[in-house]
Structures are given as C-alpha cells and as structure tokens.
Amino acid sequence: MREIFDLYSYLKISGAQAAGRRLKAREAGIHVPVFLQADISVHCNLSCPGCENGYIHTKHQEELMTVNEWDVLFREAEKLGIRFFFLTGGEPLMEREILERAARYQNSWFLVFTKGTLLNEEYDQFFSDHRNLVPMLCLDACSDINLEKMGKSSYLYESLMYSMDALSRRDIVYGTSVTLTGENRNRVLTRGFLDGLNRRKCNGVLYLVRDEADGHGAGHGGGNPAWDGSLRLTEEEKEEVKENLKELWKDYHDMVLYTLSRSGHFLGQPFEKAEVYRVSAEGNVYNSPAGLEKLGNLREKDLRSILQR
C-alpha cells in the first residue's frame, strides 16, 4: 500500500514537546486535554442528520467568539500543549478568516469538519498552501443514515466524491468522518468501503459514536430531530466495532482509523485515554464534545485558568 500521513506516527515523533508541556501543566494543577473541539461556526448552507449544528443554539451574533478571540485561544492552547483541534460548526468553511488565523499555528493540526459543498479551487489552493489544516469530509450523506430525510442526498454524494478527487489530485492530506449506527456499521466498517476511500487517497476515517451523553449535554435543546436513541450503538456493538477496527488496522495501517464518542472518549488504542474538550461558539469550555460539564467561559477567564483544577 502507498505511504500516506499517519496520525499515530505523527504523535509519536512530533508530539513529544506537546506531551511535555501537558505534563508540566498537570504538575501545576492544570488539566490539559490532548484534543480540543472548537465550534467556530454556527452557520451552515445545509441541514443534515448527525450535524453538530443541532447542538449549537446562539441567538445573537454578538454572543459569538470573534476572530481575535479564536486567535487568542489557539495561541494559548498551543502553549499549553494542545496540538490537535477539531474545527466544527455549522460549516467551518464559512469562517475563512478564522481558518486563516488557525493556519498561522504551524505546530498544530486543525481538522476541519466540512460537508464539502463549499470546497472549490480557491479553497483547494488554501488547503494546499496551509498543510496544517486538514479537511475532514463528513460522509453521513452517503452512509445510509436517514437518507429519505435529507432531500439533497444525491447532490451531497456527488459533491463529496468531486471534493475527494480534487483534494487527491493536489496530494492534500484529508480525512473523512462518518457516524456509526447499528444500521450502517456493517457497511462502513468493511474493506470495500475503505478501499473506495483509499483509491481516492483518503488519509483516514474518524468514526463518530453516539452514546449516553447525547441528550444530556449543554445546548442540546432537542438537537437535531433526525437523531434519537435508536441510532446509538449497544455495548455489545461497541465491542464488535473495536474488534473490527483491530482487523482493519492490519490491512490499512497507512490509514487513520479511529472511533470517538460524544462523551469524548476514543474506543480502542492508541488514544483510549486521550480526552477531547470542547469550546462552543459562545466561548463556553466543556469537558466533552457533548458538553456534559461547563468548566468556564473564555470571556471571563483565560483557558489556563479554566483548566486549573
């Protein structure tokens, strides 16, 4: 198989300094997560099941974090030892200025979760010029999740395939994300599914898992009606997912294959103990993507103070 970007190898080789900073911070009573999700956008040109936008409810524009405030967050987080950011929304590509600020932090990786419909020649060049920003194409549009409720499923599928081909032609590092359900897991956790992505030079898949955290997080407010308890995996199904991934790793060792739950936990090695915190569009800092516990607000305290235990 071809050699492509491997997240785990990057962490082992280039993450030593960041790990050292996190350890130093921990000794000072500051609990720094490995990953930080940042809801940089509340706007989106689509409405699809599984979208994080269903968890963001902001009434007024003035409540949102400004470009400069996001810049300050990225800088402080990097100093504390956070090297991996999940830029979510909404549609992050609608916040070009924030992405340009993120691109300045060359020692960090920013995974940009996008539907792909706004990717064009200009954005392809932008990602080519700023290799620390990694497009993550959301494949829920073509993974058999409530397609009858989407309306634009055919358009989204064609757009995603076009975006993959455009990114691969420029040799841009990119990944995909898909929400695992009891209905689709036997299709998206297969060699056939991964072979199709591999042929398009996809560098990895992040499988998102709904769990007990759904419905209990801050800002849920009913969320997206397409999501309900029926889409969550049972504990038995989660164990099967772990075993399937172990087998797939053997054949796709040059692809990044991980699962992440809404409670902020990875299923299986090597990130099983890594934590994912979240910063909402209003600057609230939570201890998980689902927003189970609010730790503070960045307009009242800086990140270091909020993470102080």
Residue ranges and their predicted role:
Residues R2-Q125, D129-H130:
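Conserved alpha-helical substructure of the radical SAM core
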Residues M136-D140, D144-A274, R278-L295:
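Radical SAM enzyme [4Fe-4S]-AdoMet core and its adjacent flexible, acidic
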Residues R83, L133, N203:
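Conserved acidic residues
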Residues L80, Q106, H130-R131, R170, ...:
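Helix C-cap/helix->beta junction micro-motif
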Residues A19-A28, V32, S288-R309:
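Flexible mid-to-C-terminal extensions adjoining Fe-S/redox cofactors in radical SAM and related proteins
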Residues P92, L119, L180, R210, ...:
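Hydrophobic pocket-lining residues within nucleotide cofactor-binding pockets
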Residues R96-I98, E122-Y123, N146-L147, G217, ...:
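Short glycine-/acidic-enriched loop or helix-start segments at secondary-structure transitions
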